[in-house]
Amino acid sequence: MAIYAIGDIQGCYNELQQLLEKIRFDAAQDRLWLVGDLVNRGPDSLRVLRLVKSLGDRAITVLGNHDLHLLAVAAGEAELHRGDTLDEVLNAPDRDELLVWLRHQRLLYAEAGYVLVHAGLLPQWSVTQALGLAQEVEQALRGDDYAVFFEHMYGNSPHGWRDDHRGYKRLRVIANALTRMRICTPQGDMEFKFKGEVEKVPHGYLPWFDLPGRKSAEVTVIFGHWSALGLQVRGDVIALDT
């Protein structure tokens, strides 16, 4: 059995199929770990969702910001952006089945010294704490009033974590860290506009994974989201958004 980790697919079904053929993926015994952003930008989000869903427990995916955006649009709590390629999913006959499945995916997964997340973990979060916080958002997504979460999801503040955050403000910080973060201050204050190369990170900020004392440094975090990083492989992180 082999486990293959794959970066942001973003609706690129043909490229995904070519990759699976190249690695000779065998759904009977191999597993896929997907860093999220299954949908949007590419032309075939619908086929990507159908394929990953069909793999059942052979594929583990965490949710990315584009996946959450699709769910928010479908719930009537967000508008499509220019350049979105989600219409085919939203108009599909199996739309509801696919969206329910997507809502029930994780935001964070940990196994055997590896952690799978779309964007990153705040420096003050241990893996155990982060898993618990991710479950708070997952429960909101899976509940009957999930649309209320999407009503409050968008926004950049609060910029950092505090244990006494409550309600949807708390859930927003958790979701932003796990699905949108690239850089933050040593205190864990996030900045969301920057998308460039590491060498151009604004003064006072660092890539989340380079912060001294990061509590998740004892595991290898597999993530995507930051395309300007390219492929990065080191002991404590593997970046796959290439």
Language model: regions and residue ranges:
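Active-site-proximal beta-strand elements of phosphoester/diester hydrolases
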Residues: 2-10, 114-120, 238-240
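Active-site neighborhood of phospho(di)ester-bond hydrolases with catalytic His/Asp-centered motifs
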Residues: 6-7, 33-36, 61-64, 221-224, ...
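Short, basic, glycine/proline-bearing loop/turn elements
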Residues: 31-36, 79-90, 190-197
